[in-house]
Structures are given as C-alpha cells and as structure tokens.
Amino acid sequence: MEHIQGAWKTISNGFGLKDSVFDGPNCISPTIVQQFGYQRRASDDGKISDTSKTSNTIRVFLPNKQRTVVNVRNGMTLHDCLMKALKVRGLQPECCAVFRLVTEPKGKKVRLDWNTDAASLIGEELQVDFLDHVPLTTHNFARKTFLKLAFCDICQKFLLNGFRCQTCGYKFHEHCSTKVPTMCVDWSNIRQLLLFPNSNISDSGVPALPPLTMRRMRESVSRIPVSSQHRYSTPHVFTFNTSNPSSEGTLSQRQRSTSTPNVHMVSTTMPVDSRIIEDAIRNHSESASPSALSGSPNNMSPTGWSQPKTPVPAQRERAPGTNTQEKNKIRPRGQRDSSYYWEIEASEVMLSTRIGSGSFGTVYKGKWHGDVAVKILKVVDPTPEQFQAFRNEVAVLRKTRHVNILLFMGYMTKDNLAIVTQWCEGSSLYKHLHVQETKFQMFQLIDIARQTAQGMDYLHAKNIIHRDMKSNNIFLHEGLTVKIGDFGLATVKSRWSGSQQVEQPTGSILWMAPEVIRMQDSNPFSFQSDVYSYGIVLYELMTGELPYSHINNRDQIIFMVGRGYASPDLSKLYKNCPKAMKRLVADCLKKVREERPLFPQILSSIELLQHSLPKINRSASEPSLHRASHTEDINSCTLTSTRLPVF
C-alpha cells in the first residue's frame, strides 16, 4: 500500500497538487481499500511485518559481520540450532557467547545459556560474540615473491609466488588458499604476555591467563631454541579440524575472483583456545615433557571458561606409526629453516671409490640418487661457532646455479662435515694438461679460458670468493664444458683459535697471490686474489707447463713470490697465442692487487678475442667429401659407352 500511496503522490505532482494531501490516512480511495482488503494501521509505520514467528525461525548475527537464519524444531537447544552455522565458519560454541537482542532499551542484550530451549526464542534476534578473554588474532595476507628458498606450509612443495600472513608468517600457494586455517597466532604478542605474568589486564583490556597456565607456557617457551625465536617463526599448530569458511561476507566491496585469496583482508576469525596455544608452544621444544598438561583439571580449561562436552585428554595422542627414534622425528615448522631440506642423512649416501685428497678434505665417488661426489672435510670435532659458520656458507652455496659451476646437492653433518656435489665424468684440467698431455687447439684453449672466466664471474656476482682457484678444481665435463668446483667454504679453509676465525694462507703455492702469501692484511682474500689464481690457470693453458718449474724448493717459491722477486715466465707462451691473450695473462698476474682486472672485464676481453679469430669458411664450389651411399653401388661398366662412328 505504501507503493500505491507513493504512486498517487507522483500523479498528484503532475497536476500541481500538494504532497500533504496524500499524507493522511484517508488519502486512499475506499474502492482501493476494499479491493485490497487492507487498511493501514498507525502501529505499522516504519516497520515491516515480521513473519519469523509464524515460520519457526531465529535470526542470528554472527562475528565478522555475518548473519544467518536457523530453523527451530521442538526439543532443540541453542547449541543444537547454531552448531552447524558456527562450524561452517570455523567457530566453536565453547569460545563464544550468545545474546538475545532487546528492543527496549535499544542496543541492550541479554546473555543466554547454550542449553536454552530454542522454541522459546522463535521470532527473536540473537547475536553471537567471542568471549572477552579469548586471545584473538586475525590473518593479514599479502602477496609475496619468495626470493629465498621457501616451501608451502600446506602442501610442503616449493614456493616462489604465493601469499604470506604478515602476523604469523604462514605461507602458501594460491591454489592452497582454501586449506589455510582460520586461526592466526601472533607469537610476539604471546611472548610479550608471558614476560608479565603478574599483570591481570593487558593494554588492550584482555585479562591475562591464570598463573598455572602462564607458568607452563613460560616453561615451554624457555626451552625454545634461540634460532627459532623470531617474529615469523610459527609452528605447525593448525592440527584441529576446520571447515572452509564461506566466501559470503569475506570479500571486499568489489567482488574479486574466487580463485584468488583476499589480500590485506581479515579472514574468518578463529578464536584461539589457550590449550591450543600451549600445545603449539610445546611443539617448539625438542624435549618437551609429556606430562606438561597432566595437572589441568578436566572440567575447566586453563583460561577458566567451560570446556566442550567431550573431555579433553591430558596428553595428546601420537599419530599412528610415529617413532621415537631421532632419525624419524619430524621437526616442528618453527624450528626448520630452508637449510634443513638440504641436509642429507649419512646413511643415505654410499661411498665407493676414493678419488683424491686435498688440503681441505678427501673426495669420494658415491651414490645418492645417482652418481655424486662427496667431499669429507678435514674438520675434527667442529665447535658450535664452526658449525654455524659452515651452515651459513652452505646457505650461500645452495643458491648457486650455473652451467660452469658444479651443482651443489646437499651437505652432511653426522660424524664429519661433508658436501655433496654433482659427479663429473671428465678429468680435471690439471690432469689433461700435465698428466695426459692432451693436445688442445688454440680455439679450444681460448674457449676453456672463456668458460672458466664466465663461471668465476658468476661466483663473484654472488659475493663468493673461491680461495682455491687452480687447474685441479676445473673439470672438463662431457667434452669441453667447464665445471668449477671446491669454491667458497671459508670456514673450512681458515684456521680457528677457540671461537674466533683466523685467516691463514690457503690454496696451493703455485696459484697463491703474493698478498695471500704475505698475509699482511687481516683478510687478504679478494676478487683480485682469485684473478691472480686465474692468471696462473691461463699460463698453464697457454704454455702447457706449471710456473716456476725451474725452482724445486717450495719455501723458495713462497719467499720469492711473496717478496715480488719471481713471476711466471711469459716468454714460454705458445707462439700462436694471440697478443690479446698475452696481454690478459700479464694483466691478471700483476703483483699489485689493485692493478688486476675483474672478471667482467676479463670475460668481455676473451669474448672479443673469440669473435676476432679468423675462421676458414668452406668454399661453395668444393665438392662434398661424403658421397651418397647409392654412388658406391654404381658399376664401373655402366660408366663406359660405345664409341660412335665419326662421319
């Protein structure tokens, strides 16, 4: 009838009548009133007729600005009616309170018990809120490209482009977004709460946990390793069953694609029971006491509100098939870093042939998902400082990916420190030049020099100093593909005095730069020291000999090179060696470190030299030396012909 009355007003405006004429109760024609059988009452003004009392339904307002309407049957309680609506949104009745909204005075609400008969509330409006003392945190997702090695917390697969919660650090793929738990634990706030056990009210007005729970959580946190206590370390506490939250009410004003998670939006919030938090913090510890929760009463939760009807066991059950042995123990997520996935169990690697021994370790050929090279380092009983420094360097080595670099595959720490790299079938450059005396052509020697400079340029771009650049560590793989190995690992190539790292001359004498031999600086190793070693390799390529072959005394070589009295004899370079290569060898072997070029300049010089080399193009008129197969079957008699008579 209101629409009809509005229509009459519209018509009246067309005839210049006043709107006040139609405002009274008698403005409608009696004919219209009789036809519709409806007469407007003063009590109906501004109120839509409520049909909920006749349809046995209750309107419920839920957290996160959601609402629903539930059907009521006889004998059902509020818990029974609202259980499904709460479950699909990832909520628990034990962490919520239900209120009945009172019309007068407006905004007042009366708390109800979950066991209240729902039939007595038909037609009423209810509101479900979180309990005030429930520690509540919401997700804050942001799109992120993980430049460092990362794995999805849901599918445990490699993660490059995905999302991460800025609060708890939970990271996942886009296609795994539907499985992200709704609970978000801000561990920095929890630890801040644990630091003040005597405060009853926090800054946000949230009551603190009871002393018993505080003490247990504080004991658990005290056992957390320091390495895992950072703001984004989040253990795998999402072990409870949560349904996927409905998309209704979770999108922004501009509806987005359902295949993309909402970025910078608060997800459906899951209240955090302190029992879950206590179990989560206990997961951080490797040696958590199994009876940490045995003293909790069964009828009350640690925070004081009533527990679910199902009693909670005092000790969490182990998953079937779990083993207490250390090798099968699954580490908590908060304790894992990306290096964990690169550690190889010693029992998985089978060593076979001993390849050789060097200054820093022994190399073996082994089997680990195929042929690998295992270098067992000469580090006996590493100190915690050495072990941590070794892990830091491994974190750098595992990021190296280049065609001219030996592929790093993992490391081992049990019994001895060892690194595992790809296996190179070819021999080292040293063996080719000085043992087998392989005869390379000049363009092949220049290409080997180019590939070596290319690999070293990559390492220096990664801020990795080789420290032991020599022909023994350059391998020719599957033909003439250069592979550089044994790079980095300053921890192994240095001497330790207690917990302090002391630099010492490392590498072979013939390839050591003069400043490294002198050891006058605190850290003589630099990009230029690698360039000097590379210059010695160029000298080997262009002469086929080792430098200082006329000096047989090792100490004399150290003294003369360190003082600058001796340098490689460049007159022994091959006669057909290009002049540009001769200049490059001389520049790399400069006695003053600052005068040596860096590898970007070296690489560009060699590439320019390669392009300038003369190439003999095949003549177009030259016949092919490879005859077709059918020509071999031609009989010589077919080529003879009868002599024709001459007229």
Curated annotation (Swiss-Prot):
<dbReference type="GO" id="GO:0005524">
    <property type="term" value="F:ATP binding"/>
</dbReference>
<dbReference type="GO" id="GO:0048009">
    <property type="term" value="P:insulin-like growth factor receptor signaling pathway"/>
</dbReference>
<dbReference type="GO" id="GO:0005829">
    <property type="term" value="C:cytosol"/>
</dbReference>
<dbReference type="GO" id="GO:0044342">
    <property type="term" value="P:type B pancreatic cell proliferation"/>
</dbReference>
<dbReference type="InterPro" id="IPR051681">
    <property type="entry name" value="Ser/Thr_Kinases-Pseudokinases"/>
</dbReference>
<dbReference type="GO" id="GO:0000165">
    <property type="term" value="P:MAPK cascade"/>
</dbReference>
<dbReference type="InterPro" id="IPR029071">
    <property type="entry name" value="Ubiquitin-like_domsf"/>
</dbReference>
<dbReference type="GO" id="GO:0031333">
    <property type="term" value="P:negative regulation of protein-containing complex assembly"/>
</dbReference>
<feature type="modified residue" description="Phosphoserine">
    <location>
        <position position="338"/>
    </location>
</feature>
<dbReference type="GO" id="GO:0042552">
    <property type="term" value="P:myelination"/>
</dbReference>
<dbReference type="GO" id="GO:0048011">
    <property type="term" value="P:neurotrophin TRK receptor signaling pathway"/>
</dbReference>
<dbReference type="GO" id="GO:0060324">
    <property type="term" value="P:face development"/>
</dbReference>
<keyword id="KW-0863">Zinc-finger</keyword>
<dbReference type="GO" id="GO:1902042">
    <property type="term" value="P:negative regulation of extrinsic apoptotic signaling pathway via death domain receptors"/>
</dbReference>
<feature type="zinc finger region" description="Phorbol-ester/DAG-type">
    <location>
        <begin position="138"/>
        <end position="184"/>
    </location>
</feature>
<keyword id="KW-0597">Phosphoprotein</keyword>
<dbReference type="GO" id="GO:0031267">
    <property type="term" value="F:small GTPase binding"/>
</dbReference>
<feature type="region of interest" description="Disordered">
    <location>
        <begin position="236"/>
        <end position="269"/>
    </location>
</feature>
<feature type="compositionally biased region" description="Polar residues">
    <location>
        <begin position="239"/>
        <end position="269"/>
    </location>
</feature>
<dbReference type="InterPro" id="IPR002219">
    <property type="entry name" value="PE/DAG-bd"/>
</dbReference>
<feature type="domain" description="Protein kinase">
    <location>
        <begin position="349"/>
        <end position="609"/>
    </location>
</feature>
<feature type="binding site">
    <location>
        <position position="375"/>
    </location>
    <ligand>
        <name>ATP</name>
    </ligand>
</feature>
<keyword id="KW-0067">ATP-binding</keyword>
<dbReference type="GO" id="GO:0071550">
    <property type="term" value="P:death-inducing signaling complex assembly"/>
</dbReference>
<dbReference type="Pfam" id="PF02196">
    <property type="entry name" value="RBD"/>
</dbReference>
<dbReference type="InterPro" id="IPR008271">
    <property type="entry name" value="Ser/Thr_kinase_AS"/>
</dbReference>
<keyword id="KW-0862">Zinc</keyword>
<feature type="modified residue" description="Phosphothreonine; by autocatalysis">
    <location>
        <position position="268"/>
    </location>
</feature>
<keyword id="KW-0808">Transferase</keyword>
<keyword id="KW-1003">Cell membrane</keyword>
<dbReference type="GO" id="GO:0043410">
    <property type="term" value="P:positive regulation of MAPK cascade"/>
</dbReference>
<feature type="modified residue" description="Phosphoserine">
    <location>
        <position position="43"/>
    </location>
</feature>
<comment type="similarity">
    <text>Belongs to the protein kinase superfamily. TKL Ser/Thr protein kinase family. RAF subfamily.</text>
</comment>
<dbReference type="GO" id="GO:0035773">
    <property type="term" value="P:insulin secretion involved in cellular response to glucose stimulus"/>
</dbReference>
<keyword id="KW-0479">Metal-binding</keyword>
<feature type="compositionally biased region" description="Polar residues">
    <location>
        <begin position="298"/>
        <end position="309"/>
    </location>
</feature>
<dbReference type="Pfam" id="PF00069">
    <property type="entry name" value="Pkinase"/>
</dbReference>
<dbReference type="GO" id="GO:0106310">
    <property type="term" value="F:protein serine kinase activity"/>
</dbReference>
<dbReference type="GO" id="GO:0045944">
    <property type="term" value="P:positive regulation of transcription by RNA polymerase II"/>
</dbReference>
<dbReference type="InterPro" id="IPR000719">
    <property type="entry name" value="Prot_kinase_dom"/>
</dbReference>
<keyword id="KW-0963">Cytoplasm</keyword>
<keyword id="KW-0723">Serine/threonine-protein kinase</keyword>
